[in-house]
Structure formats: structure tokens, C-alpha cells
From Swiss-Prot:
The gene is rpsS. PANTHER family: RIBOSOMAL PROTEIN S19P FAMILY MEMBER, SMALL RIBOSOMAL SUBUNIT PROTEIN US19M. GO terms for molecular function: rRNA binding; structural constituent of ribosome. One of its GO terms (biological process) is translation. This is Small ribosomal subunit protein uS19. Coiled coil: none annotated. It holds the Pfam family Ribosomal_S19. Protein S19 forms a complex with S13 that binds strongly to the 16S ribosomal RNA. GO terms for cellular component: cytoplasm; small ribosomal subunit. It comes from Jannaschia sp. (strain CCS1).
Length: 92
């Protein structure tokens, strides 16, 4: 079920404040955020966010294609190492 249109996109207030400060300063620093649930807005295009995945901050460069999606979609929380090899088959 998608979010109601009249509510608008959800963005944590501190993410908006950090993005505004970064744009005003003009420096292209990584903005560390913990809000994976926040929606990517058009004013974030061109900025780099460090999205926390539970262990470290993953740098995410925001492009126009990402608008309307969540930050958490670009910071995977699980690492897949593949299935373990069968030791019996290896021995032969």
C-alpha cells in the first residue's frame, strides 16, 4: 500500500536541515544520516549522503533517477557470501 498523496513525502527534519547547510556551504562533503526511511527529494540531487546500514555509512550520490525513492534502498544491510561448497563432492 502506497502513501496517501495528500500527506506528501516523508523526510526527517534533520535530513532537510543538513542538506540545506551543505548546499549553502558549497562544499561537497558526505552528509551522514541514519534515516533510511526518508524519501529522496529533488533538492537533494547532486549531494552525497552517507546512509547508515547498521554497521557503517554507505556513500550515496543522489541523481535525478532516485527522486521519490527511499535512502534505505541504496544502502544494503545484509551481505550474501554465497552457499557453502559441498565438502563431499570436493573430496572426490
Amino acid at each position: 500500500m502506497s502513501r496517501s498523496v495528500w500527506k506528501g513525502p516523508f523526510v526527517d527534519s534533520y535530513v532537510l536541515k543538513k542538506a540545506e547547510k551543505s548546499k549553502e556551504s558549497g562544499r561537497n562533503e558526505v552528509i551522514k544520516i541514519w534515516s533510511r526511511r526518508s524519501t529522496i527529494l529533488p533538492q537533494f540531487v547532486g549531494l552525497t549522503f552517507g546512509v547508515y546500514n547498521g554497521r557503517k555509512h554507505i556513500p550515496v550520490n543522489v541523481t535525478e533517477d532516485m527522486i521519490g525513492q527511499k535512502f534505505g534502498e541504496y544502502s544494503p544491510t545484509r551481505t550474501y557470501y554465497g552457499h557453502a561448497a559441498d565438502k563431499k563432492a570436493k573430496r572426490k
